[in-house]
């Protein structure tokens, strides 16, 4: 006859304050956190997942009276386990081998000397199976969402296959004597990612010219600030009007900058002004929730009219400012013809042309004629993203060749569960593709410029596709906010820290 199951620690008490504090603090930890590998909704805090798994698998002292016969002895042991949990949930201790060995021993004591397997059938962003793996448990995960499956494979399945493997990029393995966890994998992600960026610049760099400041110095562009435009409904003055939420480029104290728009010869001219004395209130922009106002004469433009013009494919865009890398931070420069002309490129042939869902609550752009996936990007962005995507496949071939040259047998592909050169090339290419996908979140015409933080704001700030009037087009070939190299570094740092 089987004995009754023992009461677990989670059924009695938990150090909730420590768990809550660690979970809240996780939100401010960015570089190296697994959540930065790729965006996914409603990720569970790692500290909570780790604590709950441990407390579910470890017996409460009261269920082991042969070891802890008195209430006092049980309280003392419970306090010891709580102290261990308080150390376990701290982010700084995530890769403390000695601490996690102690945790594994406690789990073994409560499970007949074994480390049990853990299954999360709806793993989502992978917090539970990832922390199960960190605790030394056999982790199994599944999900209905293919993105979740890919993220979970990249966090949980791939790194252990190449545990402590040195990188294969020529000359990199010799940089240190020992490669721990997935550090070698992360090093190759960086090196082949930089190759992708450099090759992309060679192919499409002419589409991203440097900008000349008023003093004559050249600077790398971080972002181009655009405003969508609509023809004024006033027949006496049918000017092409910019639709702008805010003319402000920077509200940072001492670095204030904004755009002044003026009508000259029936056209709008834009000038960057460096002054704290900028537009306020109703003058801060030209469009709001109820519609817009025409530049010059102030003609009211209803939201319905803007939507009609959008569905008739009559919305345009004006370049209103350029953000560039300066010697002491961001600099803001007035637009010019060189950068307007660089924007005018042909739509590439191999872009996703599917229709957006008909869901006006969460997908706002079809109301304005942007009903296909490709409509959410400028042509230049589509050229950049298709180029980067194509280069991931080319990078895989380079990785395979370099791995073979390093003496690794070719073996089967990663999907077959192998760990040879072919599987390794697949693994690195997976992370490179995730970096391109992250770049997409910062490379659409639905991104905006954060004028207090002086940085790009991504599309998925919330779980919806909004309509954005004045949008920021990041330079994917720069090394600044919204660039491919920036997204690559987020991925590489996440890979470095995952348990392998």
Tell where the protein language model's regions lie, with residue ranges.
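Conserved SAM/SAH-binding loop
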Residues: 125
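Conserved glycine-centered beta->alpha loop in an early N-terminal alpha/beta scaffold
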Residues: 122
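Nucleic-acid modification enzymes, centered on SAM-dependent nucleic-acid methyltransferases
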Residues: 2-119, 129, 133-500
């Amino acid at each position: 006859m089987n004995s009754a199951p023992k009461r677990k620690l989670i059924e009695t008490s938990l150090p909730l304050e420590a768990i809550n504090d660690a979970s809240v603090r996780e939100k401010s930890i960015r570089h190296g956190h697994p959540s930065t590998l790729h965006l996914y909704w409603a990720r569970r805090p790692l500290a909570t997942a780790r604590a709950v798994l441990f407390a579910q698998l470890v017996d409460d002292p009261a269920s082991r009276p042969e070891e802890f016969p008195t209430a006092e002895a049980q309280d003392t042991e419970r306090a010891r386990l709580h102290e261990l949990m308080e150390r376990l949930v701290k982010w700084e201790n995530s890769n403390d081998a000695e601490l996690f060995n102690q945790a594994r021993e406690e789990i073994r004591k409560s499970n007949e000397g074994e480390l049990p397997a853990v299954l999360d059938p709806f793993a989502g962003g992978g917090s539970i199976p990832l922390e199960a793996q960190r605790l030394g448990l056999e982790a199994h995960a599944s999900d209905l969402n293919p993105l979740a499956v890919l993220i979970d494979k990249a966090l949980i399945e791939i790194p252990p296959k190449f545990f402590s493997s040195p990188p294969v990029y020529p000359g990199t393995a010799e940089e240190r004597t020992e490669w721990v966890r997935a550090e070698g994998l992360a090093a190759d992600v960086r090196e082949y990612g930089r190759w992708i960026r450099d090759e992309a610049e060679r192919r499409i760099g002419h589409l991203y010219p440097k900008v000349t400041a008023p003093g004559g110095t050249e600077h790398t562009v971080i972002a181009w600030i655009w405003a969508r435009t609509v023809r004024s409904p006033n027949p006496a003055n049918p000017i092409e009007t910019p639709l702008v939420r805010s003319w402000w480029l920077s509200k940072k104290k001492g670095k204030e900058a904004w755009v002044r728009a003026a009508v000259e010869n029936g056209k709008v001219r834009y000038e960057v002004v460096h002054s704290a004395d900028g537009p306020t209130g109703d003058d801060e922009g030209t469009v709001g929730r109820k519609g817009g106002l025409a530049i010059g004469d102030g003609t009211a433009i209803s939201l319905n009219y803007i939507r009609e013009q959008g569905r008739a494919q009559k919305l345009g865009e004006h370049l209103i400012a350029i953000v560039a890398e300066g010697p002491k931070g961001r600099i803001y420069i007035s637009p010019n013809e060189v950068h307007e002309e660089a924007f005018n490129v042909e739509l590439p042939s191999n872009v996703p042309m599917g229709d957006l869902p008909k869901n006006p609550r969460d997908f706002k752009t079809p109301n304005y004629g942007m009903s296909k996936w490709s409509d959410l990007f400028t042509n230049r962005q589509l050229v950049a993203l298709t180029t980067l995507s194509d280069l991931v496949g080319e990078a895989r071939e380079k990785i395979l060749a370099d791995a073979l040259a390093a003496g690794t047998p070719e073996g089967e592909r990663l999907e077959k569960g192998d760990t040879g050169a072919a599987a390794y090339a697949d693994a690195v290419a997976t992370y490179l593709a995730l970096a391109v996908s992250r770049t997409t979140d910062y490379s659409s015409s639905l991104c905006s410029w954060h004028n207090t933080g002086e940085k790009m704001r991504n599309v998925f700030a919330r779980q919806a596709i909004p309509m954005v009037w004045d949008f920021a087009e990041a330079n994917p070939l720069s090394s600044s906010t919204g660039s491919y190299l920036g997204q690559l570094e987020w991925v590489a740092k996440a890979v470095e820290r995952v348990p392998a």
